[in-house]
Structures are given as C-alpha cells and as structure tokens.
Amino acid sequence: MLNKFCKKPLYEVTRTMARVAMGVQKAETVIKNARLVNVCTAEIQEGIDVAIAEGRIALVGDASHCIGPETKVIDASGQYIAPGFMDGHIHVESSMISVGEYAKAVVPCGTTGIFMDPHEICNVCGKDGVRIMIEDAKRSPLKAMSNAPSCVPAVAGFEDTGAAIRADDIREMMTWDGIMGLGEMMSFPNVIGAEENIHAELAETLKSDNIITGHFSIPDTGAALNAYIASGIRCCHESTRAEDVLEKMRHGMYALMRYGSAWHDMPVIIKAVLDNKIDDRFACLISDDTHPDTLINEGHLDHIVRCAIKEGLDPIKAIQYVTINVATCFRMDHEMGSITPGKCADIVFFDDLQDICITRTMIDGDVVAENGQMCVEIGPANFPEHVFHTMHVGHPITAESFRIAAPAGAGKTVKTRVIEIIPNRVGNYERLLDLPVKDGFVEPDAGQDVMKMVVFERHHETGTKGVGFLKGFGFKKGAMAQTVSHDAHNLLVAGTNDADMALAANTLVECGGGMCAVADGKVLAVVPLPIAGLMNDLPVREMAELVAKLDAAWKQMGCVINSPYMTMALVPLACLPELRLTNRGLVDCRTFRFVPLFAEE
C-alpha cells in the first residue's frame, strides 16, 4: 500500500537503481552541483549531484558517470536542494477548495506530500465523503495521503452530524488504498476512560499496522497523557504550551507544532525546543487549517518554516521538521523524507537558507512547479451530484427563530454564560455576564462586545437548535452565517440583531452552504461552498478574492481579528476547552456536560 504514492514501487526497480548508480544504465535526470540539505546528518553538503531514474533517487554524490546523451541535466550551482515538504496534519476542506485546486496552491510552495484528515466532509457525507477526497486527489501530482476520520461526531452525544463512524467503518477504511492511519482522536475522554467503541477503533487501526494520530488538547502531562499515549496514539497537534510539547516528546509522541491561518501556536510552543537541550527528532511543523488567502499571500509549509527560522530555529532543523521527522512519524521514511538512494525523488530548490523561497518543485523526478507556477496540467474535478445538496434545515428560518426568552422572573438583566474567544488560539473562556432583558427576551450587548449566536441542525431536518452568546469579535452591527462550523458543520449564525441573522441564514440555505456577512438588511459578501457546504471547485485565487471580500465585510461590521471566520468555526467544537455551543446546547468541555445558558438555572 505504501508504494502507491510513488511512481513505481522500489521492489520493481531495484536492478535499475543499482545499474544507474554504477553508471551501467544512464539516469533520466541528474541534478548537478547542488548544496544538499542533508536531513539525515543535519549538515549542508556542497557540490552534490543527484541521479534519478523511475521516479527515485539512484545516487547522491558525483553523478558524472550517470549522465548519458538523453539524460536531463539540471544545473543547481549556487542553489540548495532539500526533500519535498510534507504536512503531517491538514484538513484540505478548511482551505475551501478541492484537493486538486489545493495542490495547485501548495505544490509551487514546495509541498510534495500531505497527510490529510478529511473528517470535515465525513461529518457531512460519511465514508463516501472520504472516498470523494481520495479520488479527487488522484488528479494531481501532490501525494495526498489520507487518515480515516476517527471521531464522527467529534464527541458523541453532544451534537448531530450528517453521519457517524464506528469501529466497523474503521475496519473497512483501513483496507482502502490511500488510507495511512486513523485521523485525529479527538475523543480523548473516551480514550483515557477506556470506552469500548473508541478503543475498538484504536484496535482496528493497530491490527492493520497503521498509525493513530492524536488530539490531546487538555493541559495534563501526567496520568491522562500517559493513558492516551499508551493506547497507541503516535502524534498530537493540539499543544498550546511549551511544556505540553516537551512532555509529549519525552513520552515518545510526535509533537506537531501548528501554525495555520488562525492558530498561531508555534511561536509559543517552539520554545520547548529552543529553550531546552533536547533531541528534537519528535518535532514537526504543520498547518492544520489554512485559508485560500493565506496560501496565495503567504504560502504553505514554506511560510511556516520561514516563521520558525525567524523565531530562532536553525534552518536545517526547520527543514527536518517538515521532511524526515514527518516521514518517520508516519513510518514512511523508507520511501520519502530525505534525499538518499532509493527514496522517491521529491525535491525542492531554493536560493537562501535563511529565507526559504521555493523556486522549483520536483515530485517523483518530474519538475511539477517552477517559479511559483505549476508546470503540469491538473484536470477538472468530478464530484457526485449528492454533495451539492446538503442543506436540510427542514423549517423556515425567520427573525423569530433567533429570540432567546429570558428565564421566569428575570429583571432588567440576567446572568448569562457567554463564550469568549481568544484570537489566534483554539481555546476559549466561559464568562458569566449580566445581559440586558427587553420585552421578555435576552438581548446582545455591544457595550460588552457580546452578540447572539444560534446553531441550527442542517443534516436531517430535525429542527433542533442551540442558542447562546458570544464575546470577542467586535461586531458593531450586522450578522454572519457559515456552514463551516466544526466538526458537525451545522448552520452557525451570529449577530447583533435578529433580522440580519435571519437574512444571513437564509442566504446560505439558498446557495447550498458557505459563509456570508450581512448588515442593515443587505448581503455584504458571500463565499458559496456548494460541495457539502464546505468547499468550492473554483481556482484558489478566485476563492482567495471571495474570502478577501468577506474579510472586508467583517471589518466593516467591526471585527478586526485575524481569520475571524476560522475562529468562529471552532465555537461549536465540543472537544476543545472551555465552553462550546452545538445544535443541542451549551457544552462545558472541561466536564463534558450540558450546562444551562443562564447561571441562575
């Protein structure tokens, strides 16, 4: 199975590798006189040649004897070469584009492989959604390796999703081509609590000899972390403190340090490496969630590597964190992750080690991108019709749908549980605030930066909804709505008044899902996401333009935080601390219990 991500399996071409290395058979391509970033020994080797045949590296050293009349020679004098970059944890759906369009954005940035967790579309479309993503990936040269979603729903019993995944589904998916392991195990309470179905999922993965990826988001480095790792979980991307990273690596867990469009954990947690004299083979850099405007304006892993270097990380180490360390984490280092004989010829070229900007990307020995542009054609997408029909709210949404009745006997104010977001972080705070009551209904309070929020179930026409209040976005007017609302991806609406909230909600119902901003009875911006309410197959630049218009609309309404729609999308995710709102109600994610909206109740 592992060889399916290379042009040819090594067992088919071992004789060719030997012949080319010895010069008996000439190489298809030779890279001459490069500065090799050797991720195996953490050194720069000057004047290195690389001979390539059948998509693999046959020789590293002096390749003069490997050059024949038909050999393509690439003069890399003065340039650095490194293994292709790999993202160890990514949700392509968060980029709002198909895998094929995603490849067009990231391959020119030096990304040659990703380990994607398609649990967003799985929450809407079930296992079929995972197959759709795997199939879509086949139209591009990007090595889009997939993990089977583990927690659908994210935390059972707290929300309603479009589908559910159980151990027998995991057993089936582990037999699929393209599946590398189990997606992030978000249900850490059930792991450490030895819940039967969750541990059955772990067992099915381990029996298939695949790896389990993690999501341990609580600040516990004692018995709970040990129980989690001892259950077979190999890596985690949810560290928000340097001590979390350090303890995870000390316990043999790969620490995937995140730097996405909205989650800027890396500058804080990389201090685990910078401030301690430790072996960092268990450290990786990942993106998790990246918006199209970030991909266009800043880049992908190349951007994260540059940011890590600016934080003080040695450039060679930064490159190791997106190459050999990732490959080893996923037990793929025998195939990729280094420029060494026998490995896939996934290679990136750049001029400056301190400011890494990719000039050429090679995958399986073929130059697929150069100077920021793809060199190969990627065919059109072909999605099944049913993924374009996933908005099943089941009842009319009007301004009255957003009224929140005050408890009996309430005075002019009522003490209310409010979710306060933390910009650029995945966590939030529970606050108890006095909110105004008018004509028997609880109102938003712009003076406290508090707006109203409702989550409507949109998969099975159940008519259920959760109501709450939200602080920290800075809205002075208007409303927003989005169907990108992790992980159930129900219809999330927040705003300052009921009329604008209703208009925002109905705008998305009519267009099949997406994100929109509304103010004063007018739609300011819409990002249509008709594929499961999560993605569009428009080119990434067109999507980036739509997102930029949405961002401008949010600013017009008063919100100036970074990637606010991504922060908003996490408000319903009931596996992250502290307080969340799903279609079933408010969830205290420290105790995993529903709590009343009003503190007096």
Task: Please name every model-derived segment.
Residues 34, 55, 78, 89, ...:
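Divalent metal-coordination and catalytic microenvironments
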Residues 22-24, 43-44, 66-67, 136-138, ...:
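Solvent-exposed alpha-helices and their adjacent loops that cap or buttress functional pockets
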Residues 1-48, 52-53, 58, 107-109, ...:
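Active-site microenvironment of metallo-dependent hydrolases
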Residues 2-20, 25, 100-211, 523-528:
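Divalent-metal coordination cores built from histidine and acidic residues
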Residues 91-93, 119-121, 149-154, 185-188, ...:
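Active-site beta-loop-alpha junctions enriched in small/polar residues
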Residues 129, 164-184, 190-257, 264-285, ...:
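Histidine/acidic residue-rich metal-binding segments in metalloenzymes
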